[in-house]
Amino acid sequence: MIQYLQVGKIVNTHGIKGEVKAIPLTDNPRRFNKLKWAYVSKEISNEMPKFDIVSVKHHKNFVILKFSGIDDMNAAEKLKEHFVIIDRKDAVKLPKDTFFICDLIGMNVFDTEEKKLGVLTDVLSTGSNDVYVVKSDNNKEILIPALKSVVKKVCFEDNKMVVDLPQGLIDDEV
């Protein structure tokens, strides 16, 4: 599993005192309130700078962050297009049968008869339930509802998901 999680993307500065505006990459932006520090980098690596978080504010669909040592707009400007990254051990604990999207991407998806349907490439949030986007070997997309009645098994050790597809969800050409 991935050690680091991107929880936000810095898209702009906010004001003149070094605050940045970030798009949350989490389903619950209030999680930022509990963060004491974060890495800030364009990509995940072993040399990401670590910043203490001085303050967190919420404005519309954004999170306004103030990092220690970033005290003016010029310093904040240099953080644009960077990600706010946390260590997995500092992530919120998920309820049973829920997963981080980054852990599902790339997973091989099979039906209950062990026929490979494809590889999970994306997760769509629809409001009522998520939908898994699975790309088949012949490049067709299969949209699979992320429901307990459909997803029968998720095995990270084998990088495998088993689904019981509702009748008529896919044609036989997949």
Swiss-Prot record:
Record-level Gene Ontology MF annotations: ribosome binding
UniProt domain comment: The PRC barrel domain binds ribosomal protein uS19.
Cystines in this chain: none
Highest taxon in the source lineage: Bacteria
One CC-aspect GO term: cytoplasm
SUPFAM superfamilies the UniProt entry points to: PRC-barrel domain (SSF50346), Translation proteins (SSF50447)
Full protein name: Ribosome maturation factor RimM
Gene3D superfamilies: PRC-barrel domain, RimM
Location (main, coarse): cytoplasm
GO biological process per UniProt: ribosomal small subunit biogenesis; rRNA processing
Assembly information from the UniProt record: Binds ribosomal protein uS19.
Compartments, record wording: Cytoplasm
Domain PRC barrel: 96-169
Function: An accessory protein needed during the final step in the assembly of 30S ribosomal subunit, possibly for assembly of the head region. Essential for efficient processing of 16S rRNA. May be needed both before and after RbfA during the maturation of 16S rRNA. It has affinity for free ribosomal 30S subunits but not for 70S ribosomes.
Keywords: Chaperone, Cytoplasm, Ribosome biogenesis, rRNA processing
Encoding gene, per UniProt annotation: rimM
Family: Belongs to the RimM family.
